[in-house]
């Protein structure tokens, strides 16, 4: 019996591949959210924002958190590229937009950011989430798509 697959590995099923793609999208969302919040925290810990290495080196913890945020961005990019390999862009991209909502909701609810909850912004977040859902909905069977 011939086995074309490496020992112990089964061929990837479409469902398994799709799940993997969604997990990569989720990883990208969570990492970019962590990057935004980490960099925000790091920047607000500095006495002033300057591209002055001496100021940054005098505050090593905020600098490390900012650099960790940049690292999270890099990892997020890797997750995003992996997600694009197995997830249609018209599904992955709207899901990625949920990171905007997640960053806002966390910044409002985590006291050290002290972001105000504003009705207009909250409505905007709701529209982002609603848009992501609407773009991701598949048409009902038998429904003709235009375009």
From Swiss-Prot:
NCBIfam families: PRK02971.1-2. It comes from Aeromonas hydrophila subsp. hydrophila (strain ATCC 7966 / DSM 30187 / BCRC 13018 / CCUG 14551 / JCM 1027 / KCTC 2358 / NCIMB 9240 / NCTC 8049). Residues 45-62, 115-121 are periplasmic. InterPro entries: Flippase_ArnF, Small_drug/metabolite_transptr. Translocates 4-amino-4-deoxy-L-arabinose-phosphoundecaprenol (alpha-L-Ara4N-phosphoundecaprenol) from the cytoplasmic to the periplasmic side of the inner membrane. This is Probable 4-amino-4-deoxy-L-arabinose-phosphoundecaprenol flippase subunit ArnF. GO terms for molecular function: carbohydrate derivative transmembrane transporter activity. Keywords: Cell inner membrane, Cell membrane, Lipid A biosynthesis, Lipid biosynthesis, Lipid metabolism, Lipopolysaccharide biosynthesis, Membrane, Transmembrane, Transmembrane helix, Transport.
């Amino acid at each position: 019996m011939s086995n074309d697959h490496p020992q112990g590995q089964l061929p990837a099923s479409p469902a398994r591949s799709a799940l993997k793609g969604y997990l990569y999208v989720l990883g990208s969302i969570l990492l970019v959210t962590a990057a935004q919040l980490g960099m925000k925290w790091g920047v607000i810990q500095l006495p002033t924002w300057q591209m002055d290495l001496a100021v940054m080196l005098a505050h090593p913890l905020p600098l490390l958190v900012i650099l960790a945020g940049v690292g999270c961005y890099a990892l997020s990019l890797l997750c995003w590229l992996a997600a694009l390999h197995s997830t249609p862009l018209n599904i992955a991209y709207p899901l990625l937009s949920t990171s905007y909502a997640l960053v806002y909701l966390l910044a409002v609810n985590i006291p050290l950011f002290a972001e105000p909850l504003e009705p207009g912004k909250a409505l905007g977040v709701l529209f982002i989430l609603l848009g992501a859902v609407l773009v991701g909905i598949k048409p009902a069977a038998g429904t003709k798509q235009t375009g």
